[in-house]
Amino acid sequence: MESWLFLLGILAIAIVGKNKSLIIGVSAVMVFKLIPQTQNFLKLLQTQGINWGVTVISAAIMVPIATGEIGFKELLNVIKSPAGWIAIGCGVLVAVLSAKGVGLLAMSPEMTVALVFGTIIGVVFLKGIAAGPVIASGLTYVILTVFNLVPGH
């Protein structure tokens, strides 16, 4: 019962905040929760969902390359600018932090609750997007490492 109340609360916040992605995500989880024999699928979604999402995002990012909108000329132009190098650096940093964050979530699943709560606040009230949990977990890992507070170490 507690999980239903929690999900309904998140759904209500998502509706008030008019966040379609969160509304769809919570609604889908609630529908799967209603259907008998979906525990294994929900577990699979929990363990592989982020990877699936990253795959979809990666495919979406590749579309301009596939359609010819972005080619080597654009790549060469962007690496000639400071903004391009900053973007490359940020991409590398986020990739490394995300890898560390996924490791932290594996070591300390209870951290997920705080990250999800923070992500919901950011998504609903600050008009962010829900790509935050992996990046947030990576930042959390770095901060916890600095203060020697990483769970399990």
From Swiss-Prot:
Membrane topology note: Multi-pass membrane protein
Keywords: Cell membrane, Membrane, Transmembrane, Transmembrane helix
Residue spans crossing the bilayer: 4-24, 52-72, 85-105, 115-135
Top-rank taxon, per record: Bacteria
Location in or out of the cell: Cell membrane
Cellular component annotations (GO), alphabetically ordered: plasma membrane
Family designation: Belongs to the UPF0756 family.
The name this protein goes by in its record: UPF0756 membrane protein LCABL_15860
Organism: Lacticaseibacillus casei (strain BL23)
